[in-house]
């Protein structure tokens, strides 16, 4: 037999961005509780609004199933005395398990006999267990929390009401003075209390009180109303998943409405208008069918269609004030030159241990010019780098960016173009912030890519130099994002930048600038490990086998595009018939070469058989060809070596008693192993 179960936590309005994650957390905690208590159920449904977190468990069993439990006791030699009677240890075990001594049996595990018991456990009634769900509710955690009144509990918002029902029965418990009942609350202004007679009545009972408890249904209602408005007005209202998710969790009964603003505000940069509407007011911007921004907006009301005109006028008034402020800020920004703005950066501290923004920009300039040298850029390009790195943070002191931090870079590009900077420099000002997320867009220009890499590497290494690195989930300065972004940009451009050398040179530069809390060798090692870990994430995203990832990162991690190519090519050919014997042969070379002693060079005159000469000849050809080969051809070259390597080992005793011959053979294998290890640590690859 089964019944439905309903748990609703009624709250004061939660921040919209935490509603979905909170109800999913509640679902998981209830699911875990059910599994831990071995209570069967069909399905769990979740419902959420800004004022409630709810789970409805369908067909929850009315009692736990009876079950047989086993328990292991002491070893037989301890359980029996010399006369074969039960020892105190055995009798104590039986008592602790609430069974009679005659119920004890023996079972052999790995050659040793132990006492075992089997006992039937009668399942408890679900109603006897459900009150412990109080601990599930109070154990929830949130990014932001508060306590209220004299209560010790910290929660996302004060708990105002609770429902816990198993069928028609109310499950009694109390949290912060609020007792469970079968009564919920409707819309704050349109609804009344809602009595829930059965858990399955919950959605409809709340709908009668102007609450759509299903977040997906609220979202769909908003989308449908937006589409209707588009058709009616011949507008475009572009899809914005983040904004749609937020407004869905801001309202309980959504009604879409439109408003207008003065056309003169269209003279503001489009990004300023859109950001004002979206970020400050949670409005949807409106476009023509040709993609032109129009002097209208769409918002979502938490209510019905009554007095929509009045609501629209109120929203227009608020937006008008916002746009007036934005227009003032923009006009003020146009009065200052870029160089005047740059001068103010010397008064802004980047970090107390790393100096001002001006000092950071100077360091980034050195890094960017260093990278340009590695990439063989021309002098004209370097002059662009110098101008760019002298100004690229200037928009941080503008009024618009002060009001809308998310427009940094975008406004820099616009102001730079207005003041006559080269388009390439203006674009790079915007692009140096990219990517803005793990999967975000990358810079599309060479100059933007270079400055983005330089800025991110300088930030990363600078913080490591002053002993500030991510710990666990804490990364307040976004260093993982910086490293990941730099690696992605390098990969996308296919730039063979010697990262180990670059890291070392940047560390030396940072120390020369005064960032000296850790020895250079420690910083270099930590940064290299950190970058390798970011590479692991990228390779995992390419669905590369973990053993192959270990192999290529253990090889030469210097040139990032080549490393990623090596991983992809090894992964692609891992199922080929020749792959396993090739890896085994190469691994054998590497393992034996570890016995090589420094200083010994290969002397062909000491070869005793044709197989040594054949391997030497192949190695000499490999030396000549290797640098010019594509990555896939390097792997093919190793595969072609396999028969020569096998023949060599079949006919040559490397560890001979003759030290001169032994060392000469080890020297030959060591030279070959150096090429193999540069490609990958082949012994990390699983070919079993």
UniProtKB/Swiss-Prot annotation:
**What does it catalyze?**
tRNA(Gly) + glycine + ATP = glycyl-tRNA(Gly) + AMP + diphosphate
Compartments where found: Cytoplasm
GO MF annotation: an example: arginine-tRNA ligase activity
Cellular component terms per the entry's GO annotation: cytosol
User: Which InterPro entries would you find in this protein's record?
Assistant: DALR_anticod-bd, Gly-tRNA-synth_bsu, Gly-tRNA-synth_heterodimer
Tell me the domain of life.
Answer: Bacteria
Q: Which UniProt keywords apply?
A: Aminoacyl-tRNA synthetase, ATP-binding, Cytoplasm, Ligase, Nucleotide-binding, Protein biosynthesis
Q: Does the keyword Ligase apply?
A: yes
Catalytic EC class: ligase
Quaternary structure annotation from Swiss-Prot or TrEMBL: Tetramer of two alpha and two beta subunits.
Similarity-based family: Belongs to the class-II aminoacyl-tRNA synthetase family.
Q: What protein name is recorded for this chain? A: Glycine--tRNA ligase beta subunit
Which species expresses this protein natively? Listeria monocytogenes serotype 4b (strain CLIP80459)
Classification from the root reads: Bacteria, Bacillati, Bacillota, Bacilli, Bacillales
Q: Which gene encodes it?
A: glyS
């Amino acid at each position: 037999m089964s019944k439905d179960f309903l748990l609703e936590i009624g709250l004061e309005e939660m921040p919209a961005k935490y509603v979905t994650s909170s109800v999913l957390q509640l679902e998981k905690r209830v699911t875990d509780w059910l599994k831990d208590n071995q209570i069967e159920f069909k399905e769990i449904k979740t419902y959420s609004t800004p004022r409630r977190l709810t789970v409805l468990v369908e067909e929850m069993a009315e009692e736990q199933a009876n079950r047989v439990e086993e328990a292991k006791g002491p070893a037989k030699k301890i359980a029996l005395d010399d006369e074969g009677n039960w020892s105190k240890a055995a009798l104590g075990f039986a008592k602790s398990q609430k069974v009679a001594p005659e119920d004890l049996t023996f079972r052999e595990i790995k050659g040793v006999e132990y006492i075992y018991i089997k006992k039937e456990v009668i399942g408890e009634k679900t109603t006897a267990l459900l009150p412990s769900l109080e601990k599930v509710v109070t154990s929830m955690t949130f990014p932001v929390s508060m306590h209220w009144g004299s209560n010790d509990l910290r929660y996302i918002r004060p708990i105002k009401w609770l429902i816990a029902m198993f069928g028609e029965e109310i499950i009694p418990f109390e949290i912060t003075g609020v007792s469970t009942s079968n009564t919920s609350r409707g819309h704050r202004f349109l609804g009344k209390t809602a009595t829930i007679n059965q858990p399955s009545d919950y959605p409809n009972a709340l709908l009668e009180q102007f609450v759509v408890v299903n977040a997906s249904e609220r979202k769909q209602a908003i989308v449908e109303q937006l589409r209707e408005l588009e058709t009616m007005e011949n507008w475009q209202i572009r899809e914005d998943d983040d904004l749609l998710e937020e407004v869905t969790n801001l309202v309980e009964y959504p009604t879409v409405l439109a408003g207008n603003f003065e056309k003169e505000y269209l003279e503001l940069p489009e990004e300023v208008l859109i950001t004002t509407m979206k970020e400050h007011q949670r409005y949807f911007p409106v476009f023509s069918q040709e993609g032109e921004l129009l002097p209208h907006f769409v918002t979502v009301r938490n209510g019905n269609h009554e007095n929509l005109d009045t609501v629209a006028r109120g929203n227009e008034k608020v937006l008008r004030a916002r746009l007036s402020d934005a227009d003032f800020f923009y006009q003020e920004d146009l009065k200052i030159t870029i160089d005047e703005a740059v001068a103010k950066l010397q008064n802004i501290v980047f970090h107390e241990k790393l100096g001002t923004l001006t000092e950071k920009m100077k360091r980034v300039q050195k890094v960017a010019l260093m990278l340009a040298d590695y990439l063989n850029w021309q002098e004209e390009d370097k002059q662009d780098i110098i101008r760019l790195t002298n100004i690229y943070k200037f928009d941080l002191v503008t009024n618009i960016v002060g009001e809308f931090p998310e427009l940094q870079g975008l406004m820099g590009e616009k102001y730079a173009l207005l003041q006559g900077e080269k388009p390439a420099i203006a674009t790079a000002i915007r692009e140096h912030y990219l990517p803005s997320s793990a999967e975000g867009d990358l810079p599309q220009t060479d100059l933007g890519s270079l400055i983005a890499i330089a800025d991110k590497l300088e930030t990363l290494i600078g913080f490591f130099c002053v002993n500030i690195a991510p710990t666990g989930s804490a990364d307040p300065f976004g260093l993982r994002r910086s490293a990941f972004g730099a690696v992605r940009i390098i990969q996308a451009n296919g730039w063979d930048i010697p990262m180990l050398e670059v890291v070392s040179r940047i560390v030396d530069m940072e120390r020369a600038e005064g960032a000296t809390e850790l020895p250079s060798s420690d910083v270099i090692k930590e940064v290299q490990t950190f970058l390798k870990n970011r590479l692991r994430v990228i390779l995992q995203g390419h669905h590369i086998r973990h053993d192959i990832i270990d192999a290529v990162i253990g090889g030469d991690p210097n040139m990032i595009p080549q490393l990623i190519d090596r991983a992809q090519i090894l992964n692609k050919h891992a199922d080929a018939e020749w792959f396993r014997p090739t890896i085994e042969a190469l691994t054998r070379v590497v393992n034996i070469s570890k016995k090589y002693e420094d200083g010994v060079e290969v002397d062909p005159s000491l070869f005793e058989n044709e197989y040594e000469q054949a391997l030497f000849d192949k190695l000499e050809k490999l030396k000549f060809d290797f640098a010019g080969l594509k990555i896939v051809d390097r792997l093919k070259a190793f595969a072609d070596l396999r028969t020569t390597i096998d023949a060599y080992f079949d006919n040559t005793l490397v560890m001979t008693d003759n030290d001169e011959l032994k060392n000469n053979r080890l020297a030959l294998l060591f030279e070959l192993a150096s090429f193999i290890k540069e490609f990958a640590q082949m012994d990390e690859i699983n070919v079993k």
